[in-house]
Swiss-Prot record:
GO terms for cellular component: extracellular space. The lineage of its organism: Viruses, Varidnaviria, Bamfordvirae, Nucleocytoviricota, Pokkesviricetes. It comes from the Viruses. It comes from Fowlpox virus (strain NVSL) (FPV). The keyword tRNA processing does not apply. This is Putative CC-type chemokine FPV060. InterPro entries: Chemokine_CC_FPV060.
């Protein structure tokens, strides 16, 4: 009974630690939605502004009289309905998406992957796997067999990219990145 209790506590601690040390939490799609949201919010605000300007321009009264009318809430239901109809035609806002540092890092990872699709280690700083902490790496790829300089291409959480030798072992890194870097956890 006592052994089962210790094992369950150990299991809980390991899982909790793994959850806290995951790589990037934001996906590319979420970051793209965040960028589109900002543009869509500006477009909607401009549309609403144009509706309000059309409403003001369509009045035969002077601007002072229009402002007095609006401040005293004496405008007619017809003009108010026209304004509502105009605003209803404005584009809706999409989901907010993701923004911030996570998206900046995600963009850097996506850019590095696009610029080096094979994951070759040419022109990248070589480091030993023991010099890396598990919370320091946000992306990992194994170089393609066609690369002249092969290894594991890693992106650190500061945005820099480094390579570790192909025969490296680091149990803390390979686990998170699926099949691409799982060999890091298996080599002896």
């Amino acid at each position: 009974m006592y052994t089962r209790y210790k094992l369950s506590i150990l299991f809980f601690v390991i899982n909790f630690y793994n959850i806290l040390c995951m790589p990037l939490s934001c996906e590319t799609e979420c970051c793209m939605a965040g960028k589109k949201y900002d543009d869509a919010a500006i477009d909607r605000d401009l549309c609403v502004l144009l509706c309000n300007l059309q409403y003001l321009a369509s009045s035969n009264e002077g601007i002072g009289e229009i402002l007095q009318c609006c401040l005293s809430s004496n405008y007619t239901s017809k003009t108010r309905e026209d304004l509502r109809n105009c605003i209803a035609k404005c584009p809706p806002l999409p989901d907010r998406g993701c923004t911030g540092e996570c998206c900046d890092l995600r963009e850097n990872v996506d850019s590095l992957r696009a610029n080096n699709p094979l994951g070759c280690c040419n022109d990248y700083t070589k480091v030993s796997s023991s010099s890396l902490n598990e919370d320091d790496v946000i992306d990992c790829r194994k170089s393609d067999a066609s690369c002249e300089d092969r290894g594991y291409l890693l992106v650190r959480n500061n945005g820099s990219a480094v390579c570790i030798p192909e025969n490296s072992k680091n149990d803390n890194i390979g686990f998170y990145f699926g099949s691409e870097c799982s060999d890091l956890s298996r080599k002896g």
